[in-house]
Amino acid sequence: LLNGLLLPSAGKVTVNGMDTRARRHIREIRRLVAMVFQNPDNQLVSPVIEEEVAFGPENLNLPEDEIEHRVEKVLQIVGLSELRQMSPHMLSGGQKQRVAIAAALAMQPDYLVLDEPTSMLDQSGRQMILEYLQILNKQQGLTIILISHNMEDLTGADRLILLQEGSILCDAPPWEAFNRGEKHLDLKPPGIVLLAQMLRKRGYLLDKRITTLEQMENSICRLLRSTT
């Protein structure tokens, strides 16, 4: 819906004020909104990594030197510069995801939409992808919309929207959503949040906004300093 691949059956979807139903806006909307699918194999079409990353910018009819600059830049961002001559189909699942992200970033979008980007990855690959996304958001200023059933993927988000059959059940910062305790939300908080909740019940005055291990460490250190 966000990039006009599907049109809404009711209401309308706008991107930077542009209606996705207006054909005159589709080219610009698809430049602004980049997509990374759940299975990267479904969107990797080129035999070589650098060609895959260059595919989108080439369709924008950009000068060759600009395309090369973008390819080099995004491959550095995702840490795949040394593999640029390899086939993406020879890579691991995590590396394929990084190629798909690089191809999306080469379009210089304002918004990056990722559908279950960690569902096919092991723990180390999952952590690597999530760290890349944090860097892109915090350092590059890219707006990221991450769709996931795994609440562990969402602990670093600024905003969590819980949907059920097309309706919004919850729209809040992750820490607030995880601590509401509303059974109808059917929301299982991440392990670190459950641990913080358990410690608070035992009388430890930990910050309610804890959603990550780093935040837990900082909160415990502050607590220890205040009691010495």
Enumerate the language-model features and the residues they cover.
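Conserved ABC transporter NBD signature motif
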Residues: 11-21, 29
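Conserved ABC ATPase "signature" region
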Residues: 65-83
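Conserved beta-strand-loop-alpha-helix hinge in the C-terminal portion
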Residues: 167-192
